[in-house]
Amino acid sequence: MERPDLKNPDLYTQQVPHDIFARLRREEPVYWNPESDGSGFWAVLRHKDIIEVSRQPLLFSSAYENGGHRIFNENEVGLTNAGEAAVGVPFISLDPPVHTQYRKVIMPALSPARLGDIEQRIRVRAEALIERIPLGEEVDLVPLLSAPLPLLTLAELLGLDPDCWYELYNWTNAFVGEDDPEFRKSPEDMAKVLGEFMGFCQELFESRRANPGPDIATLLANAEINGQPVALRDFIGNLTLTLVGGNETTRNSISHTIVTLSQQPDQWDILRQRPELLKTATAEMVRHASPVLHMRRTAMEDTEIGGQAIAKGDKVVLWYASGNRDESVFSDADRFDVTRTGVQHVGFGSGQHVCVGSRLAEMQLRVVFEILSTRVKRFELCSKSRRFRSNFLNGLKNLNVVLVPK
């Protein structure tokens, strides 16, 4: 059997290698993937094994000091030593109980009551963005819809000027694009981006300390963890996580779903005729898109996964994109089916590290496609989208499409 290198970002530049994932799920579902430095990691590919690892955060650590929450490539984190020192560890790379303390800090801003309060404003923004998109002609929906909507939502949640959304867009692309030369042109370019972002963060941190408001930036700036106030570097790390997590997942789920609906127009016909299905179809959108390809853990004791022995210290990588197409869980798993119910996807992770903004992301998906269903008869893809060069995010740089009016 050919031994694919799942870490290689070039493997994802044309499409997610679902054929490789399917073969490995059948033949070697806990797969040893060597790395160029002589080490390697266990690739966990089945849905049930991903769930099992995710529910044991102390046995399978996400902590930065144990290796963190993802795998890196030739550029590693892509920051200077000074940059690393200035950016603290985000709570996604912390284990309980500290991880749990951070979740408790941020969750009031993402409670069902709070989300219900902001849904109408999200709808107004989505309607305004869609209203400006010309129908019947080729447009790129990434800068017109997929990117600005979640970033405008984040601007509200963080208490920022909505006009800063494009600046946030460029910063987050640089932070997650360490393997993509379009996003990370040079160390000098990254240093400039980091300097701009650090200045923005310091000003925001000081502002929210001096004048607290009802926003996530205030919650993060004034948090106390283990009885101690957070430092600026911790605020920066968690603000970065909030911007990336709250933007890239929603943005790419919108884009991938439109691509899929252009390929399966019967599913769009169903949603147009039965828009009430969008309350559950958003889970299918995330499952099929898998905006986050993987997360990493480190085994803290000798153990086993799916019958495979795992040694203490071994790297374990959970391939969400594979788990979301697991045929033993999802019938006709490669097919996008808006009538599918009870979708237990792992697109936002699972267990104690499940994405804190998952409800917000699915709400934005529902609102966008509710509005589009009243205006668009079908989506016609004009060209293949350029993809992120990344083993971490399933990202589209552009989405050239015609929105055919009703």
Swiss-Prot record:
Name of the top EC class for this enzyme: oxidoreductase
Cited InterPro entries: Cyt_P450, Cyt_P450_B, Cyt_P450_CS, Cyt_P450_sf
Cofactor field: heme
Binding site for heme: 355
PROSITE patterns documented for this protein: CYTOCHROME_P450
E.C. number: 1.14.14.84
Residue ranges of the TM segments: none
Function, in words: Catalyzes the 8-methyl hydroxylation of linalool.
Database matches in PANTHER family: CYTOCHROME P450 YJIB-RELATED, P450, PUTATIVE (EUROFUNG)-RELATED
Protein name per the record: Linalool 8-monooxygenase
Organism: Pseudomonas putida
Origin organism lineage: Bacteria, Pseudomonadati, Pseudomonadota, Gammaproteobacteria, Pseudomonadales
